[in-house]
Amino acid sequence: MARVVFRDARIYLIQWLTKIRHTLNQRQSLNTDKEHLRKIARGMFWLMLLIISAKMAHSLWRYISFSAEYTAVSQPVNKPSRVDAKTFDKNDVQLISQQNWFGKYQPVAAQVKQPEPVPVAETRLNVVLRGIAFGARPGAVIEEGGKQQVYLQGETLGSHNAVIEEINRDHVMLRYQGKIERLSLAEEERSTVAVTNKKAVSDEAKQAVAEPAVSVPVEIPAAVRQALAKDPQKIFNYIQLTPVRKEGIVGYAAKPGADRSLFDASGFKEGDIAIALNQQDFTDPRAMIALMRQLPSMDSIQLTVLRKGARHDISIALRYRLFCPPYWKKS
């Protein structure tokens, strides 16, 4: 037992001594390393001190060897010009901008595309435009159901709920069921208007002289007879003549006045176009002026009217009883 205890104590003592020796060896090695580090740091310090001293010596030598007069920096040549240069103020800049050296600025306006006009369709109503009467109140001679009637702008057609919106030289604009429709002049009326000239009226007048119409007396109100006997110019109170234009005056549309007794008794029909008076062409504006001057001295007048493409002569007695032809003499 004692041997075992002694052996264990010896082993423990040997291990302890081994650790002590190992620790001492480590400390000795650490001291050696520290000494080497101290030597390296000391060498670096002296090296840096040597470099700094050399740099300072070189700078001092350059400062001493070069004179201050030689090393003085001369002033820039353009420096005084900068000091003396005139500065532009806002007024100068504005003056330059007003010269418009590169042209005056013109803003380009964006082009606005105009909507294209919508074409107006031709009306399908069963009506025919026979003539256009221009004047203070333009009218249109429209045929409905075989009857001709003169309508003014804004009036409504008798057989249709269509309003005359606009009257032009060769067509009429109608407003029907909220839509605008076009009623053009009939083709036969266009051709009739085209051939109605002085020569045609002259030929018609010659035929009227060669074959005069036979008239029979008709009864008219006494008030009308008395009014015409006193002043023949009052005939225009009973029969209104409105100029019809197509590249000039082609005639006068005959319409009844406030008292239509003379209009009906003389044989006029609404829509008749008077183209000649006493064999004088109505297409000449001077013919109406001559009529107004000669009317007070006339006893009767003869009107040549155009009705549905045919010409008719109507005689009116201004100072005696009124006569009208029992038949119509066509050209």
Curated annotation (Swiss-Prot):
Its main location: membrane. Signal peptide: none annotated. The chain crosses the membrane at residues 44-60. Belongs to the GSP C family. Involved in a type II secretion system (T2SS, formerly general secretion pathway, GSP) for the export of folded proteins across the outer membrane. One of its GO terms (cellular component) is plasma membrane. Keywords: Cell inner membrane, Cell membrane, Membrane, Protein transport, Transmembrane, Transmembrane helix, Transport. The keyword Signal does not apply. In many other E.coli strains this gene is part of a type II secretion system, but in MG1655 the locus is missing a number of genes. Coiled coil: none annotated. It is a single-pass membrane protein. InterPro entries: PDZ_sf, T2SS_GspC_N, T2SS_protein-GspC. This is Putative type II secretion system C-type protein YghF. It comes from Escherichia coli (strain K12). It is found in: Cell inner membrane. One of its GO terms (biological process) is protein secretion by the type II secretion system.
